[in-house]
Amino acid sequence: MPEPAKSAPAPKKGSKKAVTKTQKKGDKKRKKSRKESYSIYVYKVLKQVHPDTGISSKAMGIMNSFVNDIFERIAGEASRLAHYNKRSTITSREIQTAVRLLLPGELAKHAVSEGTKAVTKYTSSK
């Protein structure tokens, strides 16, 4: 009985082998599309609060989603407030009011004080 031909063993799961493709003349290399996220900022805040703690990519994805959600809610509420008051510009006042409306009690107070601090720091650096 003939033995089946042995083929090269399949690469192990997770092995990273570079696959090189020859590029023809005139072909343009495709640039990787940039994906914006808040991950570097979340990481910086994490290191300020808990310097010895890390974060998984799944948790980072959740945090990114959370920040995007809060951003959209605040922007939407601020836009509504500007529209109600017949204003065409969203100022720090609309943002502050939107934060007070959206966030509960103590959290809103802390957010407003941190926001005021950030705006003051920005205007003084100009």
Swiss-Prot record:
Entry's localization field: Nucleus; Chromosome
GO biological process: defense response to bacterium
One annotated Gene Ontology cellular component of this protein: nucleus
Residue location of crosslink Glycyl lysine isopeptide (Lys-Gly) (interchain with G-Cter in ubiquitin): 121
N6-acetyllysine: residues bearing it: 6, 13, 16, 21
InterPro entries from the UniProt entry: Histone-fold, Histone_H2A/H2B/H3, Histone_H2B, HISTONE_H2B_site
Residue positions, PTM Phosphoserine: 15
Entry function: Core component of nucleosome. Nucleosomes wrap and compact DNA into chromatin, limiting DNA accessibility to the cellular machineries which require DNA as a template. Histones thereby play a central role in transcription regulation, DNA repair, DNA replication and chromosomal stability. DNA accessibility is regulated via a complex set of post-translational modifications of histones, also called histone code, and nucleosome remodeling.
Name of the protein in its database record: Histone H2B 1/2/3/4/6
